[in-house]
């Protein structure tokens, strides 16, 4: 049994948390996030420490308990520190560049792939083979990074494609001649 829901969430200096019925709004130095939570979960705030309580030990409530706590914790971390995902592009002629507010990726297709700017997400290209996705919403940062990776996922024979910086790509051996 997971005990994630029992851990308290520390609210750091400069982060303001507001509860309105089932909606939690977290405001911090990096921005503001709000999310509607399940009505069965009870949230208590005392001395800059937030705890989540469940009404019973039903399977559904146990699952929601940890999920609710993690969602709130991710919001608090997001508005105070932010989230970041790094990707690297491997392959001859594969590269990325910024053109105004667009990010253009050449990944071996007959056309370059253009990514529009999204509110609350910052896409940086420190080198033409690296992309960094930054933002305060963990879900959105992960989704955008996954969409970029999906443009050209790494292939197992030569390892060409777009991958996360810390991702390990399992390599396969090619066919051997008779």
Curated annotation (Swiss-Prot):
Q: Which InterPro entries match?
A: Ribosomal_uL6-like, Ribosomal_uL6-like_a/b-dom_sf, Ribosomal_uL6_a/b-dom, Ribosomal_uL6_bac-type, Ribosomal_uL6_CS
Entry's Pfam families? Ribosomal_L6
Q: What is this protein called?
A: Large ribosomal subunit protein uL6
Q: What species is given as this protein's source?
A: Oceanobacillus iheyensis (strain DSM 14371 / CIP 107618 / JCM 11309 / KCTC 3954 / HTE831)
Carries keyword Thylakoid? no
Q: What HAMAP family does the record point to?
A: Ribosomal_uL6_B (MF_01365_B)
Question: Could you say which protein family the record assigns here?
Answer: Belongs to the universal ribosomal protein uL6 family.
Query: Which PANTHER family does this chain map to?
Result: 60S/50S RIBOSOMAL PROTEIN L6/L9 (PTHR11655), LARGE RIBOSOMAL SUBUNIT PROTEIN UL6M (PTHR11655:SF14)
Alphabetical GO CC annotations of the entry are:
cytosolic large ribosomal subunit
């Amino acid at each position: 049994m997971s005990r994630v829901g029992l851990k308290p969430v520390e609210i750091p200096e400069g982060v303001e948390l507001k509860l309105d019925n089932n909606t939690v709004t977290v405001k911090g130095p990096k921005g503001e996030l709000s999310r509607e939570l399940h009505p069965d979960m009870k949230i208590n705030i005392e001395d800059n420490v937030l705890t989540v309580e469940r009404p019973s030990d039903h399977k559904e409530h146990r699952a929601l308990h940890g999920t609710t706590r993690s969602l709130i914790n991710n919001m608090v971390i997001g508005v105070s520190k932010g989230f970041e995902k790094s990707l690297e592009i491997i392959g001859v002629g594969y590269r990325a560049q910024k053109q105004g507010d667009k990010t253009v990726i050449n990944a071996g297709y007959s056309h370059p792939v253009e990514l529009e700017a999204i509110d609350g997400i910052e896409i940086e290209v420190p080198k033409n083979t690296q992309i960094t996705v930054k933002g305060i919403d963990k879900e959105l940062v992960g989704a955008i990074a996954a969409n970029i990776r999906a443009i050209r996922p790494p292939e197992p024979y030569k390892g060409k494609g777009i991958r996360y910086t810390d991702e390990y790509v399992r390599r396969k051996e090619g066919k051997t001649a008779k």
